[in-house]
Amino acid sequence: QPESSAASDVYKRQVRFFEGETDNNELFSKKLAQLADVFVMDAFGSAHRSHCSTEGVSHFIDSCVGRLVEEELNSLEGILNNPSKPMLGIIGGSKISTKINILESLLEKVDWLFVGGGIANTLHKSKGYEIGQSIVENDFLEEAKDLSKNNKIILPETFVVEQKDKSIVEKTFEGILPDDIIYDVSINSIKSLNNIISSCKTILWNGPLGFFEREEFSKGTLHLAKVISESDAYSVIGGGETLTAFNQSNLLDKVGYASTAGGAFLEYIEKGSLPSLDALKAVSYTHLTLPTTL
């Protein structure tokens, strides 16, 4: 513990360097609690982690959430428990294995669920479509097949494809060859959502629709960001690449709420709770004011 008799602020280096932090070690949690009188949990992006500095410390000190966490919770609670309908969910990313639970959870809440990225490839393959050499999770084809039976799910029908000779073309299902690699949804696929987006009152989006790191395969994601920013729907977005798409297009101020979190954003949507928040609920709050969402 640093000597700080005359100081009001104590700054610790990245706590993950300390032994016991990621194991939620009780002794280290107690040591952290000895540094202050009140613990303010304001790291929503880490609220899904049961670590000493996010969960453990709250058992040994008066604790509360900060303003950022309060904003995040109020925003997410609104669209999860009392959203204006109709509601569109959009999920992208490469692996269905990391998002299958959130897909199932969202299907209970939304009117439509548009799926892109590698997740869509696995869903497409489960339905018997050719996807060439595109990223896919073959171990999850059965789960994907069950999901794809839900008529709320919308899959892209045209794609931006890199062919064997490295040329980049737009193709429909019928044109996909065994050596092709699907890297993005086409702008035409986004345009097919125009009527749905224009009728929506609420839109929730997490994850890129293509290989966003390469400029030539970021156009689907960027175009969807533009369309959503121009809609009248209340939009909530989360995840680093999704925020980057809006920020890159100078559209971040056009969304209803931009979450600072990725994993915590998804876990809260799926479960309605997070480990660090559950810990806060379990402790006593002397002289502290909490948001109504807790």
Regions found by a protein language model. Name each.
Residues 1-7, 11, 287-294:
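Single conserved hydrophobic/aromatic residue that forms the stacking wall/gate
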